[in-house]
Amino acid sequence: MIIDDVIIGKGIGDIEFSRENTIFVLIAGTTEVSLRSGITAAGASPEFTRITPTVDAEIIGEGKCLSTADPPMTPEGIPTPAIVSRAILDLTGLRSLIVNGGFSVRPKTAFFETYIEPSRDPGLDRAVMEAERVMEAGRRLGKILDGNFKNIILGESFPGGTTTAYVVLRSLGIDSGTSSSMPVDPDNLKKKVAEESFRRRNVRSPLEAATEYGDNLMIFMIGLAESIRSSKMILGGGTQMANAANLIAKVNGRTDQVVATTQWVFSHRSDLFRILGLEDRSIISVMDFGRMRNNGLRLYNQGHVREGVGMGALYSYARIAGFSREEIESAIDDFYTTFLR
């Protein structure tokens, strides 16, 4: 299959997407590292990042914000990628499921309850206090989903997750940067978190690293991959999901994971995908928001946001399922225009 704005890695083979054989699963939660100033733009302020996953879940589940008056935005007023993802879900009719990955505030929409607590700041404390419980939640959801869908697209909403991914990768000897929701990556802040984390406790095994330095998403994904054997897992996200794929390979011994992301992430951190051996197992959505009517969406082209809430994976899903670029862009623009009224 040749689609000019979707690049499918040569190690993936044929992909068949339809709303009958695919489900989108959003794992959403918080990590206290997002409260550090300058770490993430996934919220108008560090404190607001506590509620970003909550409102992202509400946008995916209900099509509107219920816990706040406005959607999560960067400090510059650029909207959450949940806007893009929900618009594509509406356009394609794809089913979705929201998972509690450690909400600070539970959303006002239906979700798969895990009773997982928010992840902690690894520079101050063990990041995942009940790792086995988180992993078991992943295993249980995997057993429910496996075999019922040909494709399971997994998205995330974890503000600060590229920082925890950076720390875990560094602990495993991978000296490469992770992406960011900001045009200029806060590399020095990420390095500071890593140094503080390693001073607190120094571990080297992949599972210990994810527990000490990571977040619930990483542990949950390891558990999920343990149970999902018949369905194809498509990790919809950027360097957070690249890190998850690496952990799954090291802990579960599986190297069949597909990572689907945007060209904004891939062009920013292609070295990490190469180092992790993911270039041939990646789907890259070459998205261009330059024609959008809304300025906040056009600014995605300037390196803001880049990825999140499965945006890149859902774009590639829609294109492979037969929707045109113009249909997708119009749906996104129309949804956001209506959303702002």
From Swiss-Prot:
This is UPF0284 protein Ta0078. SUPFAM superfamilies: Nicotinate mononucleotide:5,6-dimethylbenzimidazole phosphoribosyltransferase (CobT). InterPro entries: Nict_dMeBzImd_PRibTrfase, Nict_dMeBzImd_PRibTrfase_arc, Nict_dMeBzImd_PRibTrfase_sf. It comes from the Archaea. Belongs to the UPF0284 family. NCBIfam families: PRK04447.1-5. One of its GO terms (molecular function) is nicotinate-nucleotide-dimethylbenzimidazole phosphoribosyltransferase activity.
